């Protein structure tokens, strides 16, 4: 399947999914992490499409292109006022039946405390993705790094 990783940073997820046989597109606006990912992918003989641009500039070129979008640290990094725009973006990028696989965090921080990372509330996420989506998974991850234990939740949304 085709995977898109928004706000990919150094691309550790991109490398993992590529090693598992997925076709990966990794997006970040920062030049250094994209360069690091390209260097690492090349050294591992992996083919990963990298895009250096703002995630909100991906449509219409990438509309309905992906089976999966991986969300880990992008949502909490963007301006909270753009969260509705983010939900529209991922809906547009995914094929019908595609999945937004999100590790949503930090759940224990309020938006008013600033960021990034900006606080994320479970009810806000579910409300944002309440129409045109169905939840297929909703749990605290079995494994979390110590600093994130209990502060992140795995919620997978399927595009209807």
Regions found by a protein language model. Give the residues of each.
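A conserved beta-strand element that flanks and buttresses the S-adenosyl-L-methionine
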Residues: 70
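Local beta-strand N-terminus motif with an aromatic residue
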Residues: 65-66
């Amino acid at each position: 399947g085709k995977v898109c990783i928004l706000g990919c940073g150094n691309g550790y997820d991109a490398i993992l999914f590529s090693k598992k046989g997925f076709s990966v597109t990794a997006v970040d606006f920062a030049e250094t992490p994209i360069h690091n990912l390209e260097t690492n992918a090349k050294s591992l003989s992996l083919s990963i499409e990298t895009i250096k641009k703002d995630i909100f500039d991906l449509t219409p070129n990438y509309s309905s292109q992906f089976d999966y979008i991986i969300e880990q640290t992008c949502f909490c990094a963007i301006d909270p006022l753009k969260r509705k725009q983010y939900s529209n973006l991922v809906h547009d990028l995914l094929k019908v039946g595609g999945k937004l696989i999100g590790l949503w965090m930090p759940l224990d921080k309020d938006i008013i405390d600033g960021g990034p990372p900006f606080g994320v509330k479970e009810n806000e996420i579910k409300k944002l993705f309440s129409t045109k989506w169905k939840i297929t998974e909703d749990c605290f991850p079995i494994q979390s790094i110590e600093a994130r234990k209990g502060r992140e939740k795995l919620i997978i949304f399927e595009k209807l």
